[in-house]
Amino acid sequence: ERAYSMASYPAEGRDIMLNVRIATPPYDRKANDWMDVNPGIASSYIFSRKPGDKVTISGPYGEFFINESDAEMLYVGGGAGMAPMRSHLYHLFRTLKTGRKITFWYGGRSRKELFYLDHFYKLEKDFPNFKFYVALSDPLEEDNWKVKKDLNSEGDGFIGFIHNCVIDHYLNDHESPEDIEWYFCGPPLMNQAVQKMGEDFGIPDENIRFDDFGG
């Protein structure tokens, strides 16, 4: 069994959208070859299915729910952690038409790891209370990444680990970060860093929610 977060939101009906990246063996830079380990079992199985094949799923599980309040919301995502971000934010804006102030920070190593960007730029255009920011931790030369100097400057996004970008470009200048509700999902190291960031900024436990998909 493997746990996958849903990218779909309730208004999309019975269609279930998952973001699955096939887990290839790690690359051994010293040997200049792939490590001799098996690829991901569940992701390999999913990628081997054809349209019309039947599979068995169960759920949903977990407690990654939206708090019912008027507080500002901060979303932080990385990698395949994009899935529940889309689900939450589409429900908040497309269904609830929320007036809450919301920012979403999404990080990847290079541009090729980013996806759904057009979805969130469209939300940003449609809802003035929503802002979307992107950061790359290790941009490639071919990314031609145009670095933003601050929140309001032109550019593609920031450079650095996403939690550091949130601190440097948002939280350090925020009047009351302790009043923000935090929602996050990403690789284990990112989750740990964002969890600590919340503690450092005095966020109450009940206002910190994350989706752990077993990474």
Protein language model regions, located:
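Structural motif
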Residues: 53-55
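Histidine-anchored nucleotide/phosphate-binding helix
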Residues: 6, 84-96
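Ferredoxin-reductase
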Residues: 1-51, 108-109, 135-139
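Short, Lys/Arg- and Gly-enriched loop/turn segments at beta-strand edges
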Residues: 1-4, 62-69
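Reductase modules of NAD(P)H-dependent flavoproteins
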Residues: 100-215
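A phosphate-binding catalytic loop at a beta-strand-loop-alpha-helix junction
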Residues: 72-88
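Phosphate- and divalent-cation-binding pockets in alpha/beta enzyme and binding domains
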Residues: 65, 84, 193-197
